[in-house]
């Protein structure tokens, strides 16, 4: 079979002939792959930068962890790979499969899944979002951030405040459900002043953060209390695009009802992952099929994997490899 394979961490994937995988037990299924999204996670893992990275096997390793595929009976599903997914054939986990709506495109389904995982899991299980919450999404102009804005609204957020640097992408977020946008290109004082004004009619209760770094420091610092009663703030770290470390005053933890947590591989319970596949993903795929959850994709062919691996994709779009 043809596949995208890496032989050394950090090298470009190669389009080569590779042995077809074999299901090792009854919990695995051999499938034909149709579409796989290329995410920051995939690039980081292939380069050895992600905490879940492993050293490629000596004879090469197929990359890609999830995607749209077809079962033996012709059913089209989203699945999580046991073997790498950027190949004509792959093995997937039998209990981590979601049947796809008939009119949902392969590219949309492939692109949407990881963004749902990177937004809905944090909103639902880490932030415990409730109808009427005011939600701040820090770094909302990226692909997952755009999905997070829409899902927060779907879950009943009264107001969604979105931050980001790309001016056009920030404007686009208003059409996707954001009620207010705040640019990260302005000075610190201006940013903090706008953040304060955005909460005059109700304080932020949920913060989904894709950036970490200085903007997270400012947001957390602005929440510091003065000894009076405060509303509960659930701050959920999902990404660290602008830095892996921050400075946080201990007073932030003592002076405000702050719940500081993260959402990612290793932070969810087995029950939460089961709900992801049995409830959350099916619901979100259906919303996308109905035109109520919107994403933008760029489709490329597997044979061009080396040429497009480092392609500069615009904010809010996802690269999808079709097979």
State where each predicted segment sits.
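Glycine-rich beta-strand-centered segment in the early N-terminal region that forms part
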Residues: 21-42, 47-85
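Rossmann-fold dehydrogenase core element
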Residues: 228-239, 247-292
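Mid-domain Rossmann-like dinucleotide-binding core that forms the NAD(H)/NADP(H) cofactor-binding site
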Residues: 112-187
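Glycine-rich cofactor phosphate-binding loops and adjacent beta1-alpha1 units
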Residues: 176, 180-258
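C-terminal hydrophobic helical "lid"/dimerization subdomain
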Residues: 271-323
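Short, glycine/polar-rich helix-capping loops at beta-to-alpha or helix-loop-helix junctions
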Residues: 85-87, 165-174, 245-250
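NAD(P)H dinucleotide-binding glycine-rich loop of Rossmann-like/cofactor-binding domains
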Residues: 63-66, 76-139
